Amino acid sequence: MKRNFDDFKQFIKCKKIGVVGIGISNKPLIDFLLKLGARVSAFDKKSPDEIGEVARELKEKNVDLVLGEKYLNDLSDFDIIFKTPSMRIDSPAFVKAKEKGAYITSEMEEFIRYCPAKIYGVTGSDGKTTTTTLMYNILKKQGYKSWIGGNIGTPLFSEVEEITPDDRVVIELSSFQLMTMNISPEVAVITNVSPNHLDIHKDMEEYIMAKKNIFKYQSNSDLLVLNKDNELTNSMTGEALGKVRQFSIKEKLNKGGYLNKDSLCIDGDEVCKLSEIKLKGMHNVENLLAAFCALKDDVNIESMREIATTFSGVEHRCEFVREINGVKYYNDSIASSPTRTLAGLKAFEKPVILIAGGYDKKIPFDILAEEGYSKIKTLVLMGATKYKIKEAFENLELKKHVHIPIIMANSLVEAVNSARKVSCRGDVVTLSPACASFDMFANFEIRGNMFKEIVNDM
């Protein structure tokens, strides 16, 4: 049930608020809370030097700063605490604060609660950003004033008073954001579910339960969009509280989105031909079908077709960088899981030179070896997981007698140079790490941009 934002303004006024994490979304949140008359303290593990100019700005606004390794030692005596998404609600500091009466929430939870416009929420292990961006563009093409946020775009809560009931909002939601949510968007999309983020979640069951929160609190008039081809998402149909619309690239559906030979269809109507779309790979066909299903009630076929046949993708997602001496280089830095890397590999017509490896999210790489070996010509490994991935391919060789040449590298520069040395005219080199970036880079964007710099400097 949507609430009037005036209620929040009354609720927040003169309250003592703690904001944990001074990041991309929380800086605008702090400014917004101050504007509404709250007393704000900001907490972050970083030192004043690491935060830099932002720390000085916040102090000038009379925000109390608690910084450094012991920043969570005292969260007591706060009325409300806004936490950063990746922090677990069951951490001792939050448990203690809750016991003392604090209301613990997040920027995105409060946005969904008070946003007056229809919200389309998108989650999944892979394909979230592309699907979210497609939906945003289709809605804009239809003529709606549209907003995009959550894991991508700009923080939205500070803009909530600018949004009207006639607008449309598309948000990308991670499992971290969903873990503590007790409110769901009117339209919920789950692109797929496979093992991911098991470095943060206790186990796969907790990860799946977090994803389910996107529809757990829907009403009977709301919509849930699910991937029929994914075993885990298909099994969720019986748990839906509202309407369900599915999509499939494997079978024709009476209702929903599907691939019929070379046509992308929704509810029996052709949207466009497979040959007309610019996005590479069948995983992107799934993303398009998911977007069609989510928007079927609000847009026409023409708007879907226009975006489907002109949208060329989001940066760092199977992004063509350059061709050098007949070798094509692609940046797929977003691929932070084995399943996402597999989807990228399947977009190419022949085996590629794959650069992989990075931060260990505690997920297995057996699936990458067993389902990806036929798409890999040479494997160049780097980062914290390079030996773990190497072991998966060595096990494959023992089991199936399939040998994939493996090169070990100590940096991205070394990995790219190694890939170049073994490449020949007609080859494809792709950075598709199957891992997060945090062992070597602050985020996947920096990793992808460095890859592009290295390639463009060759």
Swiss-Prot record:
Cellular component annotations (GO), alphabetically ordered: cytoplasm
Keywords of the record: ATP-binding, Cell cycle, Cell division, Cell shape, Cell wall biogenesis/degradation, Cytoplasm, Ligase, Nucleotide-binding, Peptidoglycan synthesis
Catalytic activity from the UniProt record: UDP-N-acetyl-alpha-D-muramoyl-L-alanine + D-glutamate + ATP = UDP-N-acetyl-alpha-D-muramoyl-L-alanyl-D-glutamate + ADP + phosphate + H(+)
Signal sequence extent: none
GO biological process: cell division; cell wall organization; peptidoglycan biosynthetic process; regulation of cell shape
Pathway: Cell wall biogenesis; peptidoglycan biosynthesis
EC id: 6.3.2.9
Disulphide linkage map: none
Gene Ontology MF, one: ATP binding
Residues involved in ATP binding: 124-130
Pfam families on file: Mur_ligase_C (PF02875), Mur_ligase_M (PF08245), MurD-like_N (PF21799)
Enzyme type, top EC level: ligase
Compartments, as annotated in UniProt: Cytoplasm
UniProt similarity note: Belongs to the MurCDEF family.
Function: Cell wall formation. Catalyzes the addition of glutamate to the nucleotide precursor UDP-N-acetylmuramoyl-L-alanine (UMA).
Protein name according to UniProt: UDP-N-acetylmuramoylalanine--D-glutamate ligase
